[in-house]
Amino acid sequence: MTKQTHAIEHKVISNWINTGTSVLDLGCGDGELLSLLIRNKLVRAQGVELNEQAIHNCVAAGLSVFQQDIDTGLTEYADKSVEYVILNQTLQQVKKPDFAIKEALRVGKKVIVGFPNFCYFTDRFQIFFRGRVPVTPSLPYEWYDTPNLHFLSIADFKEYCKKNQITIENEAFISKNRAVRVFPNLLGEVGLFLLSK
């Protein structure tokens, strides 16, 4: 994913979050989004991350982050104890995405999910014409070194929400550093969703 797409993604997420609220970022990486939300939205933020180097980077930046595998659950958090739980560029990398979403919805009043759309048209072309697993800016890994375990599309995720009575309060789709308004499952490189239950 390009830095510009990443920045647009963070802007969309920031716009969905109310000022002064509590945020839990699951799979927060180096804390770039957490830092942005603290600075621009004055949120009370905490991150969860598995990667030790990313945790050290977060702590060095003054962020509150602890190490945990979100596949094991969020037992430290009471129901609806956080206003926003974020799963951005994380869902496709966890072993149990259904469990992660349900735990996020249990803990958070609202949940923000963002992921690469594995049915983006350039991915489809690479599979169809080259007969190979796609390598693109949003999916920059070879098949043998990808952290992605689950390959979902925007349509798959919407169907999942419908089946599980999860309300999609807002959605945004990004491609080539701009918003996508039509045929998001084909033209959207990244899907973002604001959820509640």
Q: What is the predicted function of each stretch?
A:
Residues 27-29:
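Class I SAM-dependent methyltransferase "Motif I" SAM/SAH-binding loop
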